[in-house]
Amino acid sequence: MEYSFPRYLLSKQSVDDRALNRTVLDSLKANLPATPIRIIEVGAGIGTMLTRLLRWELVTKADYILVDEMTENIQTAREWIPLWAVEAGLGVERIEQDLLRVFDQARDVRIRFECAEVFDFIQKKPAPADLLIAHAFLDLLPKPESMPRLLALTKSLAWLTINFDGVTSLEPTIDAALDEQIERLYHATMDTRPTRLSKNHVFRQNASPMVGQSPDYSL
């Protein structure tokens, strides 16, 4: 079977559901401003975080900008989110190719699809959001150089979830030598991971773990 990154993102929804820090999620919910709110998600993939927030009723009335640099992801999001919404009992209105509305009596969310590198998107100087989301994405960026530009996308709140912290554990131990080799090779790919971000924007590439002082960081 040919590898499909959108299929991978779709298949791991339940894994991410369980991995998200619910204490941080409760804190986020308590600090969100009154609706409607403006949300920007970078590295948004096919939109599984958006549908998760709708399922969990964290987002009820919002403008949601879904940003990803992979054309395949954005195309899948355009097609999959309406199908998901119908199955969830939500109404769907296609306003434009890249503007979708999903709604019912309790929820009304307008979704804009942006196929762009995150720093190209930032250079457009979009209006800051009430909430910035980056899910399993920060470890793709050079840090700390990229953080001021990324955080300029939000007025105050940032929910930056499931980030590689430089540590890998394989359990249970079956072959310690093999585990060590797998860990070493995996960490090498994280240290040298090529992205289009580094080609078009000048940053010093490193693999330092993200250290956050805000309660909005989810580990």
What annotation goes with each model-predicted range?
Residues M1-A34, I46:
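Class I SAM-dependent methyltransferase Rossmann-like catalytic core
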Residues G43:
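Conserved S-adenosyl-L-methionine
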Residues G47-T51:
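Glycine-rich SAM-binding Motif I of class I
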Residues L53-D120:
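Class I SAM-dependent methyltransferase SAM/SAH-binding core
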Residues D120-P126:
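Short conserved loop adjoining the S-adenosyl-L-methionine
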Residues I133:
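A conserved beta-strand element that flanks and buttresses the S-adenosyl-L-methionine
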Residues L140-T154, I162:
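A short, conserved alpha-helix within the catalytic core of class I
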Residues S156-L219:
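Conserved catalytic/acceptor-binding region of the Class I
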